[in-house]
């Protein structure tokens, strides 16, 4: 019985067309590299960096550019950073402030539910799990393989709804975080698709 309940929970999470929820992920710092250097996580996942070994005294994990969402500070061999939690969808490049050639990237997709429907279906698109002071969200959409178009810009809502009554097709959505005070932005999140019949 317990296995059935767990399996149903996993299927429900995957039905959101995003990544399944993760409690924590650790990136290792080894030999002047972040491992893994490319990471895809669900919003709200706690990410830590652990410095295993290397030929230097310290490393950092510092988010690129003026968005400035995190900087772990110096990590010595054997130390683990405090958790970084990315609450909104987007793509977040980062580097070691001491060794700029050490780079990594974290991708956080939006979630859509359901992923298929009809012209009477209202689709839910989740951009973030919690409001973040000073941050807003931009959303783009495209029909099929068409060009990306701005749909909503600078919104504070964590969830938006989409209904398309004018026939079927495939729609894609992606979002990013931006800082209201200076306009700094994350990269666009991985795109998610809905199909309308």
Where does each model-flagged region fall?
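Positively charged n-region of N-terminal signal peptides that target proteins for export
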Residues: 1-4
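Hydrophobic helical h-region of N-terminal Sec-dependent signal peptides
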Residues: 6-13
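Extracytoplasmic copper-binding redox domains, predominantly the cupredoxin/blue-copper superfamily
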Residues: 13-145
């Amino acid at each position: 019985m317990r296995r059935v309940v767990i399996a149903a929970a996993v299927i429900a999470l995957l039905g959101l067309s995003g990544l399944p929820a993760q409690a924590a992920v650790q990136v290792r710092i080894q030999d002047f590299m972040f491992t893994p250097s490319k990471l895809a996580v669900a919003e709200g996942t706690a990410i830590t960096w652990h410095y295993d070994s290397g030929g230097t005294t310290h490393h950092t994990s510092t988010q690129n550019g003026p968005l400035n969402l995190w900087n772990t500070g110096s990590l010595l061999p054997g130390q683990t950073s405090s958790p970084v939690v990315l609450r909104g969808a987007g793509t977040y490049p980062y580097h070691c402030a001491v060794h700029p050639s050490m780079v990594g990237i974290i991708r956080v997709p939006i979630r859509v539910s359901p992923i298929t429907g009809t012209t009477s279906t209202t689709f839910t698109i989740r951009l973030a799990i919690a409001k973040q002071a000073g941050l807003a969200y931009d959303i783009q959409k495209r029909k099929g393989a068409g060009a990306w178009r701005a749909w909503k810009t600078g919104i504070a809502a964590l969830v938006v709804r989409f209904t398309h009554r004018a026939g079927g097709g495939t729609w894609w959505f992606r979002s990013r975080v931006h800082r209201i005070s200076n306009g700094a932005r994350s990269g666009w999140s991985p795109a998610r698709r809905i199909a309308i019949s």
